[in-house]
Amino acid sequence: MTKNLYLGVMSGTSLDGVDLCVMDFAKNPPKLTACGFTPMPEDLRTDLSHLLKSGETSLQKLGEIDHRLGLLYAESIKRFLAEHQLSASDIQAIGCHGQTVWHSPNGNFPFTMQIGDMNLVAAHTGITTIADFRRKDMAVGGQGAPLVPAFHEGIFASPERLTVVLNIGGISNISVLAPQQPTIGYDVSVGNALMDSWIELHQAKRYDKNAEWAKTGTLIPALLDSLLDEPFFKLPAPKSTGRELFNLEWLVKKSANLTTYRPEDVQRTLAEFTVQSVVNELKTLESEKQCLLLACGGGARNPLLMQRFSELLPKWQVATTDEYGLDIDYVEAAAFAWLAYQRVHNLTNNLPSVTGAKEPVSLGVIYPK
């Protein structure tokens, strides 16, 4: 059978590295055939982290980071293809998200900024590259995020149940796939970002593997209540957020007593905050039908988070996308392969019911090989 391969490339707000996957669109539903990961070089991660936390840089520095990211994507793709015995001619197109450094969908001049020079990606790989997926949605009145729910709808929706796909990356976002209703999707809360930043600050680790540190801590109810008292949670959907809100500066503002707590107790509380802020939203969606929560993203590998979701959602079946045929670490990368496929065929790939856009459009800028 003829293959129809597209390569999805994603680097998220966690800054851990680059996810890559190949999707075969000759299959129905499309099939994930290969996946891989390239760690973010430490010097680039440091520069990006500073940029995300401060929001300040020089034009020269921004241009250099843009170039370095383009090279990272290109080299990651070439290495990935070689490892999987694939050539550039096997791939119809690359869908590359780029690296979000700012997302501000409200105000007088809404904008989103993803960097990483896609001219370099197309030139160095010899593969047509599709990128800049968010700004056209914003141009027609949308939030520019999230983009993945349309992909989730095609893969996971069922007329027999309410399905919510929860992606726990740096930020937690959901796709709500309800029978006979338009799909909706939006950011609901922080994901791993605060937990990752806190353990990096106190233990110089990138993340809390298997929640080992959080499990040694004790919940701080007063801090949890303060964190949950965040105006973002009261905003109507669709809505989007990022590290420009949920960061260590925000955490400090939320608690005058932060330095008096044991760091591991704060970590345990941040984990609980991640779960409870999501659960509060899910409980507003519960229906009489079967309810399925499908978790993906790095947070789906956190046993403490998954345990607490199961405990706090007794009416729901709680599972990961692994159990439904899509590796939890590569759902977003797979979605960008799908977005590229849709763009190449000039098909719409945003959902106005999700982003708030005035109309469905075909997102993505094409960078020819």
From Swiss-Prot:
Pathway: Amino-sugar metabolism; 1,6-anhydro-N-acetylmuramate degradation; Cell wall biogenesis; peptidoglycan recycling. CDD domains: ASKHA_NBD_ANMK (cd24050). It holds the Pfam family AnmK. GO terms for biological process: 1,6-anhydro-N-acetyl-beta-muramic acid catabolic process; amino sugar metabolic process; peptidoglycan turnover. ATP binds at residues 12-19. Keywords: ATP-binding, Carbohydrate metabolism, Kinase, Nucleotide-binding, Transferase. Gene3D superfamilies: 3.30.420.40. It comes from the Bacteria. One of its GO terms (molecular function) is ATP binding. Its EC number is 2.7.1.170. It catalyses: 1,6-anhydro-N-acetyl-beta-muramate + ATP + H2O = N-acetyl-D-muramate 6-phosphate + ADP + H(+). Signal peptide: none annotated. Catalyzes the specific phosphorylation of 1,6-anhydro-N-acetylmuramic acid (anhMurNAc) with the simultaneous cleavage of the 1,6-anhydro ring, generating MurNAc-6-P. Is required for the utilization of anhMurNAc either imported from the medium or derived from its own cell wall murein, and thus plays a role in cell wall recycling. Belongs to the anhydro-N-acetylmuramic acid kinase family. This is Anhydro-N-acetylmuramic acid kinase. It comes from Actinobacillus pleuropneumoniae serotype 3 (strain JL03). The lineage of its organism: Bacteria, Pseudomonadati, Pseudomonadota, Gammaproteobacteria, Pasteurellales. The gene is anmK.
